[in-house]
Regions:
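Hydrophobic alpha-helical transmembrane segments
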Residues: 1-23, 28-176
Length: 176
């Protein structure tokens, strides 16, 4: 998401995004101390990450296909489990990764000495193993390269359109 906003609006939009994201990290908790301000920060962060999370999931599916990984299973798990998280954005890419790697992610978690029941993402086809880390990194790097290529193509298209439009679209004034 930070790179998305940097590409979209340069350093200013990148800093605005980072401020929203940091605010959510610092006060976006569901407790009395930060109930209202924290909720606003969390909702703003959810809104800011809505499009980048979904674009990233699509880029991960594309990268899996190019890298010869099981992109179809990644897509299947994405459509099934993409909402299996309290955050509307967190499970988007996690679901693709779980499907591509044929593992189950998330589930119950311990926070401050208390276990919280949470939904799982993916099918429990095999246990997660150390070799999954380089596979997940390969998928992530592939998605990053796909994002960079997409950004270059979009920016080149915008620049090309701007140049074509510059001459005929520029009004000419006649002194009269």
């Amino acid at each position: 998401a930070p790179l998305f906003y940097l590409a979209l609006g340069g350093p200013v939009l990148g800093w605005v995004y980072k401020a929203v994201n940091t605010m959510d990290s610092m006060v976006g908790y569901k407790n009395e101390a930060y109930l209202y301000f924290g909720r606003a920060a969390a909702k703003l962060d959810d809104l800011a990450n809505f499009l980048p999370a979904r674009l990233s999931a699509g880029l991960m599916v594309l990268a899996a296909a190019v890298l010869g990984m099981d992109w179809w299973e990644g897509m299947r798990i994405f459509f099934r489990d993409r909402f299996n998280h309290a955050s509307p954005n967190s499970a988007q890419t996690e679901a693709v990764c779980a499907g591509v790697l044929h593992v189950q992610l998330a589930g119950d978690a311990w926070y401050f000495g208390t276990i919280y029941k949470k939904k799982t993402i993916g099918d429990d086809k095999r246990p997660v193993e150390a070799e999954d880390i380089p596979r997940a990194c390969r998928l992530m790097y592939g998605a990053a390269w796909a994002a960079a290529l997409a950004a270059v193509l979009v920016l080149a298209g915008i620049r090309s359109s701007w140049r074509r439009c510059a001459s005929p679209c520029t009004p000419t004034y006649q002194r009269g």
